[in-house]
Amino acid sequence: IDTIAECGKVCKHFHLPVQCGSDRILKLMNRGYTVADYMRLIHYAKEKIPDISFTSDIIVGFPGETEEDFAGTLALLKEVQFDSLFSFIYSRRIGTKAASMEDPVSSEEKSARFNRLIALEKEIGAARYQNFIGRTFRILVDGPGRSDPSCYSGRNDGYMIVDYDGKPEDIGKFITVKITKSLNWALFGERVSEE
């Protein structure tokens, strides 16, 4: 964290898998940390690197997960304000400790919780990305736009996707882009300058 804060050549992005927001479930998962441990790291990183971007992994419906455990996960999402998540519904894997655990969480409940998690993630992401409208970012252009092939796309130092009206020769270059709109997990902008 300190190195990233001091070095201008490293992206201000961390992927820190938390898995869930319940100490009880984290212990069952044998994760070796608590929610408080995780949050200390998040707060330290935010203090040292104000524009830092976080992504994480979340598992919904781990064996024995209660509504209270799941509520802890939702509370964690609200506090951290992740830029995006890699979310999964728990599925039994042969050979793991969890495979032999009783799983009282029904498939329907797992799906319902997963949908609530995704809805909250979208709400948080939409609000965060709206705050970037009007700001300028230096992006590294990596190719045609993902949602619109007539655009070009790159990532800023927070690992966020930015689409803009570009040209083929921009690929591999740094371009400064002013953000004009946001949509789910993508930002759209216009070219300001080229390095």
Model-based region annotation:
Residues 91-94, 130:
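AMP-binding (ANL) adenylation modules
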Residues 17-19, 55-57, 88-90, 142, ...:
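Generic beta-strand/beta-sheet core signal
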